[in-house]
């Protein structure tokens, strides 16, 4: 059953169930893009700047990018775009897709390094509360390790990565979300049962990945995912963001 976490429901009950994460909970596993920070718009900008750099007359609007986000992974997103734009693979072989994506990653990292992002409301406080209460922290994402490291270092400083007991990225596994691979790898490394973890996600693909791994999911809808179907989520955060109290953390 889905439990709603929102400003007017925190501490209340929903059909007899409290709207806080039930103990035992030993680990909180975060997605990155859209969850820790509203970075998807920065990704879109980096894609478009990459296309312009290579002389391609492609422009990914917000509406188009919202559709493309249903496909996990940047390289996979480009391939999906090519297929649906009717561009034959012999005209745009996979080697070019890899080159494009590598340049886009470099551009995205430079944008992050220039400070053009903020953590989403409540993220910093939730992480601090989890640390105070002895929870393990981990990351399960389809983005690249370079992107993760840059964002964490920019938000928390050079030692920020040390807060996370495990970080699993899309290139570390065979299948990206909605497959459960990143989550299965995280809980394997943590040595903690899936039922003793909580995943924080912003998208339906992320929710499906965590649920397929047997992990309860709390959703924080983001700019590009507010219209997603989250009917399988265990909890949904409200407008105040990732409130630690909503997860039962003092």
Describe each region flagged by the PLM.
Residues 2-17, 21-25, 128, 144-146, ...:
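Asp-based, Mg2+/Mn2+-dependent phosphohydrolase catalytic module
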Residues 21-32, 36-121, 128-133:
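N-terminal helical cap/lid subdomain that shapes the substrate entry/recognition surface
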Residues 35, 141-143:
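Conserved phosphate-coupling serine/threonine residues in phosphotransfer and NTP-handling enzymes
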Residues 91-95, 99, 114-121, 142, ...:
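Residues at secondary-structure transition points
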Residues 135-137:
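A structural preference for short, pocket-lining loop segments at secondary-structure junctions
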């Amino acid at each position: 059953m889905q439990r709603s976490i929102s400003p007017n429901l925190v501490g209340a009950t929903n059909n007899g169930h409290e709207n806080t994460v039930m103990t035992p909970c030993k680990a909180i596993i975060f997605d990155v893009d859209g969850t820790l920070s509203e970075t998807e718009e920065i990704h879109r900008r980096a894609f478009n700047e990459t296309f312009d750099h290579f002389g391609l007359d492609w422009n990914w609007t917000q509406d188009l990018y919202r559709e493309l986000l249903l496909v996990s992974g940047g390289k996979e997103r480009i391939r999906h775009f090519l297929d649906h734009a009717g561009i034959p693979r012999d005209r745009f072989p996979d080697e070019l897709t890899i080159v494009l994506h590598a340049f886009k990653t470099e551009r995205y990292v430079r944008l992050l390094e220039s400070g053009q992002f903020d953590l989403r409301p409540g993220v910093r406080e939730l992480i601090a509360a989890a640390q105070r209460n002895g929870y393990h922290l981990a990351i399960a994402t389809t983005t690249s390790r370079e992107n993760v490291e840059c964002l964490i270092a920019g938000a928390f400083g050079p030692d920020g990565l040390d807060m996370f007991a495990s970080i699993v990225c899309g290139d570390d596994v065979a299948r990206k979300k909605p497959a459960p691979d990143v989550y299965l790898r995280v809980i394997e490394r943590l040595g903690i049962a899936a039922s003793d973890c909580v995943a924080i996600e912003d998208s339906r693909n992320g929710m499906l990945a965590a649920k397929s791994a047997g992990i309860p999911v709390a959703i924080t809808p983001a700019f590009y995912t507010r219209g997603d179907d989250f009917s399988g989520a265990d909890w949904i955060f409200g407008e105040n963001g990732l409130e630690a109290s909503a997860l039962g953390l003092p």
